[in-house]
Amino acid sequence: MTSHAPESGGLVTESTLGASNSSQTIENKGLTILGISGRRLAAVLIGWFFVIFDGYDLIVYGTVQSALAKEWNLSSATLGTIGSTAFFGMAIGAVFIGRLSDRVGRKAAVIGSVLILSVFTMLCAFAPNPWVFGAFRFIAGLGLGGLVPSVNAMTSDLVPRKTMSAWATVMMSGVPIGGSIAAVLALVVVPSSEEWGWRFMFLIALIPLVVGLPIAMKVIPSDKAIKADHDIREGHDEPAGFKDLLVDRYRWISIWFALATFVTLLAWYGLGTWLPRLMETAGYEFGHALMFTLALNLGAVIGSVVTAWAGDRFGPIRSGVIAAGIAGIALLLLLTYPPVTAVYVILILAGVGTHGTQILIIAAVANFYPSNLRGTALGWALGVGRIGAVVAPQLAGLLLAWNLGVNSNFIMFGTAALLSALALSVLLRLQKTYSVTHKVEIQG
């Protein structure tokens, strides 16, 4: 490379390219967190802010299910179908907007995702019937699905490789933080008004639209500047597309990443969507049911910290095997009808394991693929994997509609977590094989 960073530090701009024949890492000045500062840090933090609202939007439907069922006289099967619409949109958004972030640029993909997510989540508050509500949730899901791979790809381009796993963990910690906010807010807001209580929960989507987007437009660097900055620090990558994920070098790794994400998200999003309703069906009051949801999300926040440490020390895939195994065993323990205190502990462990495993998978994908494939690879894994998120609410509703009881759901979610551990074990084995035959550098 023949370009270098300006002496003043900060992000490279087009005017600085070609200024010198030497290549060096861009200097960071000011407050530094995990190796970045200045505009890079501001861009990454606004991305994290958006992920918090991504997490809020994922959990908010579960907190208002009972109110929707009462207002529109909905069955469990119909509630499951409506719950799946957002996840179906997420699956599509993750694949196509993830790819768009590689082709058009990170900034455009992030801002476009937030715009779609915020506008159509807000419109859910004014839905006159469940069918319009479901349509708005589907379109909002397109933005939901595109946001996480786009933000993670942008973050991976802006942070040093040595702190990439830690930053991936920070990014995804926003999901359970947002979910916790949804659970706490619902305790007060949903019972406050029979007509507008649940609707107000969706008006919160105005915050990223009104507050976040203007800041993002200012602090997220241009796509050309992000690419130039990354090329100077990490080297230039040739253009690549979906087909490159399935060539010999990446084929089985890509397939198993998608399978691992499928079963992990089936467990995580299934719980996030149905836990309040399941606990109410099991005989707990609405307030207690939401507190269980809060425990699940607080466990996921704790899991973000624990998996950051474990992923850095032992590798994301190896740590993911343990995390998913813990979640699976914990969820199956609910079949023993434990006391309330034990239920809280079990759900905290389930949050640590399910969401923590997904964070570790994202970190492994970001570490494994080159920059020109990173957004596409994240979109592939999250897009195909989110079919599990689509299936989970529908299956959970059907299991209840078939009178198979609450425990049938816990069996499904617990088994999914154990299958995630199995899939990651296969990836761990493939990693060892590929590191010999292809010299692939994937942190295990």
Curated annotation (Swiss-Prot):
Annotated localization: Cell membrane
Pfam families recorded: MFS_1
Protein function: Transport of gentisate (2,5-dihydroxybenzoate) into the cell. Does not transport 3-hydroxybenzoate or benzoate.
Family assignment from sequence similarity: Belongs to the major facilitator superfamily. Aromatic acid:H(+) symporter (AAHS) (TC 2.A.1.15) family.
UniProt-reported outcome of changing D54A: Loss of transport activity
Protein name according to UniProt: Gentisate transporter
Record field: transmembrane: 42-64, 79-101, 108-127, 131-153, 166-188, 198-220, 252-274, 289-311, 318-340, 344-366, 378-400, 410-428
Phenotypic consequence of D312A: Loss of transport activity
Keywords for the protein's UniProt record, in alphabetical order: Cell membrane, Membrane, Symport, Transmembrane, Transmembrane helix, Transport
CDD domains named among the record's database cross-references: MFS_PcaK_like (cd17365)
Effect of R103A: Loss of transport activity
Membrane topology: Multi-pass membrane protein
Disruption phenotype: Deletion mutant retains 85% of its transport activity at pH 6.5, but it loses 79% and 88% activity at pH 7.5 and 8.0, respectively.
GO cellular component: plasma membrane
Highest rank taxon of the organism: Bacteria
